[in-house]
A protein has these predicted regions:
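Iron-sulfur-cluster electron-transfer modules
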Residues: 1-172, 332-348, 352-360
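Conserved hydrophobic helix-helix packing surfaces used for dimerization/oligomerization
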Residues: 81-83, 209, 284
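A polyampholytic, Gly/Pro-enriched intrinsically disordered region
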Residues: 132-137, 198-213, 258-268, 325-344
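Short, flexible loop segments at boundaries between secondary-structure elements
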Residues: 175-203, 244-247, 300-338
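Redox- and metal-dependent alpha/beta enzyme cores, enriched for Fe-S-associated oxidoreductases
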Residues: 195-199, 209, 214-263, 351
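A short, acidic, amphipathic alpha-helical segment used as a generic capping/interface helix at domain edges
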Residues: 263-282
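Amphipathic, rod-like alpha-helical scaffolds used for oligomerization/assembly
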Residues: 344, 348-470
Length: 473
């Protein structure tokens, strides 16, 4: 279930079966019809979306921060074209949003921007099966665009493009929502202006590059030529293709794989980096913020020195407009995210819960709290016998006790998360809201996978033995 959503299976299937769309539907049905658990990190994202409209646990008010101060307040409130940067370009890789806005201006496009009214496009919620939140986000963004008189939505992120071009209209039809928007990737807009002789780049860059076709814009959207036309219009730049390109292009390893299985995602990313390096290119050019994060993370972990450069960033360099390299900040933010992913694995969560055993026992209602104290204080043979009697009962009892215990344990849990994960200030400030909301959804469904790992810790604690792996870092 934790695939990359790259759709290569659809291309390779000799029976032309809709494999990836079927997986997409299955995830939603498993969660909404069978009450299954989604990939745990998506519950943190969902809590952030509900509170601040983004997946990075940043503040909604800070979404426009990517925009240079001299540009803020300069865009029209209403326009037929809107620029939709998406979460990662807005909060992590600012160069993408800054460069795209500059290129649209250079192309003569008058555009508006939702600012702090922009929400995540919602695709993380859709692919993880959290369709109720996906629908909320869809309605929010569509209404926000309508309020500004928008007819065309221009995106940086290929996933955002896929949402506005394909997924929103499909769901709007099912939900009875009026939907009239055209969607374009910025490279299509700029390529059209270049072809019409209305736009050109005047700074030669003198470099050899290769191009990574994003799955959501490539295989899913068939946008192959516009990005290449932009690259080929830059003086001094030589484009060399990777072995697997266009429809056959290999995925970077992001989306569900990156969240559910980071080591597998890193291996997939390394394969793409090796293919790029084999071309002799001096840089790998991409146009997907999430691809770029994933490729940067894979390069960092594998020791690959090939620079990952966003296409808009490259094009702005060719226009004489410089933007900062986001690599260091992107790696730091991914480190926070990966820390949360690792903490939410069942075995890690069991160890984390074990570190909170004193608080958990004190949070138990009577008579269970007293029973735990009695077991811990009993002499060896009697204690061991009582523990043996408890062990088969706890998997059934613990899920019933936990909802009442969580509010009392939450302060210690928040402190433990803060000790384990070096969060940015805005994320740490929001954790008292985000973590309880996520745990309310997670724990009832996650406990069956956690309890087998947790019980040995609990038994060791009651016997007065050190429970390895429970120390707070």
């Amino acid at each position: 279930m934790a695939c990359t959503t790259c759709e290569l299976c659809n291309v390779r299937c000799c029976l032309d079966l809709p494999i990836e769309p079927s997986w997409l539907k299955l995830r939603g049905r498993l969660i909404h019809e069978e009450g299954r658990l989604t990939f745990p990190p998506f519950e943190i994202m969902r809590a952030s979306l509900h509170k601040e409209l983004n997946i990075w646990a940043a503040y909604r008010a800070d979404r426009p921060r990517w925009m240079p101060e001299d540009k803020q307040g300069m865009l029209p409130e209403r326009a037929e074209v809107a620029y939709f940067p998406g979460c990662t370009a807005s909060y992590v890789e600012h160069d993408i949003a800054q460069a795209t806005a500059c290129l649209l201006t250079k192309a003569g496009v008058e555009f508006t921007y939702l600012g702090h009214d922009e929400a995540c496009c919602g695709i993380p919620m859709l692919v993880s099966g959290l369709w109720d939140t996906w629908e909320e986000i869809l309605r929010h963004n569509v209404e926000a665009m309508k309020a500004r008189g928008v007819k065309t939505v221009v995106t940086s992120c290929p996933a955002c493009w896929l949402v506005w071009h394909t997924l929103y209209p499909e769901w709007a039809a099912k939900l009875g929502i009026d939907y009239h928007f055209e969607a374009k990737h910025w490279s299509e807009v700029v390529a059209d202006q270049i072809a019409a002789g209305k736009m050109a780049f005047d700074h030669a860059l003198d470099m050899k590059v290769t191009w990574h076709d994003s799955c959501h814009m490539g295989r899913a959207g068939k946008i192959y030529e516009a990005p290449r036309q932009v690259i080929q219009a830059i003086p001094g730049v030589e484009l060399v293709e990777m072995e697997h390109n266009r429809q056959e292009a290999h995925c970077c390893g992001s989306v569900l794989s990156l969240v559910a299985d980071p080591p597998a995602a890193a291996r997939i990313g390394n394969l793409r980096l090796q293919e790029a390096t084999a071309t002799g290119a001096e840089a790998l050019i991409a146009s997907c913020p999430c691809c770029e994060v994933q490729l940067r993370v894979s390069a960092d972990k594998s020791g690959c020195n090939l620079p990952i450069i966003d296409l808009a960033h490259l094009a702005c360099d060719a226009a004489g407009l410089q933007h900062p390299d986001p690599t260091s900040y992107a790696l730091a933010m991914w480190g926070v995210f990966e820390g949360m992913i690792n903490l939410l694995k069942p075995e890690a969560m069991a160890g984390f819960m074990a570190s909170l055993l004193p608080e958990m026992i004190e949070a138990m209602p009577q008579p269970f709290r007293g029973m735990m104290h009695m077991v811990k204080a009993s002499p060896g043979p009697l204690r061991d016998g009582m523990i043996a009697m408890m062990k088969p009962v706890m998997p059934f009892l613990f899920p019933r006790l936990l909802p009442g215990m969580m509010p009392k344990v939450m302060p210690a849990m928040l402190a433990g998360v803060g000790e384990r994960i070096a969060m940015p200030t805005e994320m740490e400030e929001q954790m008292p809201d985000l973590l309880p909301a996520a745990m309310d959804n997670l724990m009832p469904k996650m406990l069956p996978a956690v309890i087998p790992h947790f019980m040995p810790y609990m038994e060791a604690y009651l016997k007065g033995q050190p429970a390895r792996g429970t120390a707070r870092s």
